[in-house]
Amino acid sequence: MDLGTKIIQKTRYRNNIIDYKPIIDNCDFDIVENNYNGGKKIGILLPHLVKSSGGVTSILRLGTNLSKLGYQLTYISMFNDNEKDMVEAAKFNLSNYEGECLPLNKTNKNDFDIIVATEWRTVYRIMDFDAYKMYFVQDFEPIFFEMGERYLLSKKTYELGLHIVSLGKWNVDTVVKSCDVKGQIDYIEFPYEKTEYTFVKRNFEKIKEKRKIKVAVYVKEESKRLPVIIPLILDNLKKSLKLKGFELEINYFGNALPICINNGIECGKLSKKQLHELYCECDFGMVASLTNISLVPYEMIAAGLPVIEFKDGTFDYFFSKETAILCDLSYKHLEKEILYYVENPAELEEMTIRANKSILSLSWEKSANQFVEILDHVDTVE
């Protein structure tokens, strides 16, 4: 074994001990006794409060809308991030967020009426709080780990009796199917922020006249987003379309690391304004939602951009199949679909309108109200 491999393995082993030791030392893995006193002080525990995180931003949106409904919110860093840095990151993600930011070591176990875990490691840390224990689930995390310690510990978090509230129904069905759930489990609708991505009416007939097809492609350094497969598919598609007289302009966004193959424009991480401009400039938007759906297709649909998703993902769990192009792993299938809609722009417009109509009733305000309705149905203990 070379020195580099030894260093990587030693670092990974040390980091795992940091994660696992407090769990094994402090958790007895018994089902929690979960009693709610009816109060409105909510603590939300995150590993870190970081910039440019969709998951963190969703938590801030939920918390802010709960604050508007009369709840007192505190966002807590499990790893004791600097308070000033937390506030800066929160403002970066959501400039008008409401609530307080604190490191875990500045909280006490009696500070809250409700304590909410947001990631598998945070579940074990909220056990010390004298509060109603909830688990806000944005994805089924065991999927991300190979079978072993991390997989087992993450899977166990759904079996400890916390009140689970999922962002969307897919997580609920997956957790129930995969785990021995002991506590209450509910979900709120997967929303989007309407004020940031307004619908722009397009002249779809123009696409029939153009020989250049522009696509906005979401890539991220996470396997569930297919950061290697998507560029490879598009590389073959680009070469094939060129033989048919079409130029494919690929605009990658969301990536911090270089794309695996040089076949497009690497936009990196974009602001919301830049994203909306990109969506308006492109003819199609492409994203992979293999586990719980990404927020990105909602944004694209809201802006009026036709969406390309994957048959093997969860898009059709949230939307009808008639609202997007669902491709497989073959560039030939994707090419056939794109050329069909280029030749039939009226159908592309109808698909886009159908997709947009399906999200009109969604909002963070509505989802926050659903969260409150869930709390209203919990039996309270004085």
Q: Predicted regions span which residues?
A:
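N-terminal pre-catalytic "stem/leader" segment of glycosyltransferase-like enzymes
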Residues: 2-110, 215-217, 232, 242-249, ...
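A short, well-ordered alpha-helix in the C-terminal region of glycosyltransferases
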Residues: 340, 347-361, 370-373, 377
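Conserved active-site histidine-acidic residue motif and adjacent donor-binding/catalytic loop
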Residues: 256, 264-279, 292-293
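A short, active-site helix/loop in glycosyltransferases that binds the activated sugar's phosphate group
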Residues: 121, 125, 144, 160-184
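Membrane-proximal helix-turn-helix segments that form the acceptor-binding/catalytic region
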Residues: 104-105, 147-165
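Conserved acidic donor-binding segment of nucleotide-sugar-dependent glycosyltransferases
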Residues: 321-332, 340-345
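Acidic donor-binding loop of glycosyltransferase active sites
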Residues: 280-292, 305
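Conserved catalytic-core segment of nucleotide-activated headgroup transferases in glycan assembly
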Residues: 58, 75, 174-178, 187-262
